[in-house]
């Protein structure tokens, strides 16, 4: 139905995919069987005394955001896309970030991959998710839905509006908006 494409177009229009200014958008392909954020970020290996990356782009983005939040209060927006988010129960693998929705946290959310280091995501981070409702996916709980904005797409969206989507993709490649302008 074009859910992922729309998220990518949105990120492009906001200037978050512009590699010249620094990419501020990461797509996470959710896998069946995830039970913790350590399944897609990484974890601390106490035997080797190192951090093991589960997904290099996610780990590096969250590490960069944590570093930025320690060094500055003027942090540009960042968007993570959870593609096919309900292939695993969101309440399990997304719990530290879902918890942040329960209370307004001006300074973001702090979590640990193990070890002694605490990681911090600033409040300028946003999460998008695409979901399907069929026999291959997990149902979404009321707890999750109460904290989410849901946009439902018509299954025939791409067939009926393909030309408009192509125009939007061309527009997105022009970087009509730059997140850097938010801080000027």
What is each residue range found by the language model?
Residues 183-184:
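Basic, amphipathic alpha-helical bundle interface domains used for macromolecular binding and assembly
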